[in-house]
Regions:
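Gly/Thr-rich phosphate-binding beta-strand-loop-beta motif of the actin/hexokinase/Hsp70
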Residues: 2-28
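Phosphate-binding loop and its immediate beta->loop->alpha context
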Residues: 31-153
């Protein structure tokens, strides 16, 4: 059994993580978990919220070092704050509000439809895939070996 109880709020705009360290017993407190993410080119650090955004960069658009993560030196897409920032410049490559599409009755949530209205040269993903990638990012941030230093900070 894990020493931690973890709660994830996969939000339409932002996602958050809170946890309890069960090894602390009945005095355990609910604590926020800052989520490591790229903020700007080559600036990766923990933030209290993860914008629920993915940016599907063009292969030659940015050097991979600009959005590399401690657990993945060459991510397939940009996640979080940097995704939202870069997507403001190139909105046709930005996936946001993926969670809203999961319950939309007029679309196949497993079909590659996002970014909605993107030109044909932009590789699309499904709302399920986008939500899954956000959750995977959160899982990887939680599982990184030196996360305790961030939480203690």
């Amino acid at each position: 059994m894990s020493d931690f109880l973890i709660g994830i709020d996969l939000g339409t705009s932002n996602s958050a993580v809170a946890y309890i360290d069960r090894s602390k017993g009945p005095d355990a407190l609910v604590l926020d978990f800052p989520i490591v993410q790229p903020i700007r080119p080559s600036d990766v650090r923990p933030q209290p919220l993860l914008p629920s955004a993915l940016y599907l960069q063009h292969p030659n658009e940015l050097p991979v070092e600009a959005y590399a993560l401690p657990w993945d030196p060459a991510p397939k897409q940009i996640v979080g704050e940097f995704a939202r920032w870069q997507g403001a410049k190139v909105p046709s490559r930005l996936v946001t509000s993926a969670k809203s599409w999961l319950s939309h009755g007029g679309v196949d949530r497993t079909a590659p439809i996002l970014p909605w209205g993107a030109p044909p040269d932009v590789e699309k993903m499904s709302p399920v895939e986008a939500s899954s990638r956000l959750l995977l990012h959160i899982r990887n941030a939680w599982n990184r070996p030196n996360k305790r230093a961030i939480r203690a900070g």
